[in-house]
Amino acid sequence: MADTGAPGGETLLFLTDEQLRKGIEAMFFAYRGFTADPDRILDQHDYGRAHHRAIHFINREPGLTVTTLISVLGVTKQSLNRVLRTLIDDGLVESRVGRRDKRERHLHLTEKGAVLERELSEAQRVRMRAAYRAAGPQAVAGFRQVLEAMMDPAMRRHYQMLKDAE
């Protein structure tokens, strides 16, 4: 058995159900912490997490098509349209007709949208930076490996495309 060097002599290869349960619970609580600061900001604008995810990925890939955003977010066209309608009406997102295909809609953040995106992202970067510094580089690399291994194959492809675009 490979020892992780973790307190309690936990091993990498043979985790018990109890150890896995603790990991699941840690993910739940970490997610609550990760989303708490942006949630407070979103509440001030009467937005929710769906708005945040849309803003994040539109910022990440300006000109992203609605179809691609639906795929990345794993939502229905109907649910995304409600979110996009709000963001467009509020002046945070612009929808532009495709140059090659007039049926396509390409999404871009406006300056107002970019300001909100920076505020939301900075709130999460502060929390992640502190956690990463506390954990150290090996833990950060291991954490990323675990997250990538947990992704569904389609989501992993989207994630890989974003990484490759850097």
Curated annotation (Swiss-Prot):
Q: Which GO terms describe its biological process?
A: response to stress
| Domain HTH marR-type, residue spans | 17-152
Q: Superkingdom of this entry's organism?
A: Bacteria
Biological function:
Necessary for photosynthetic and respiratory growth.
Report what the protein is called: HTH-type transcriptional regulator PetP
Q: What organism is the protein native to?
A: Rhodobacter capsulatus (strain ATCC BAA-309 / NBRC 16581 / SB1003)
Q: Which SMART domains match?
A: HTH_MARR (SM00347)
- Which PANTHER family does this chain map to? TRANSCRIPTIONAL REGULATOR, MARR FAMILY, TRANSCRIPTIONAL REGULATORY PROTEIN
User: Where's DNA bound on this chain?
Assistant: 66-89
Example GO molecular function term? DNA binding
- What's in the keyword line of the UniProt record? DNA-binding, Transcription, Transcription regulation
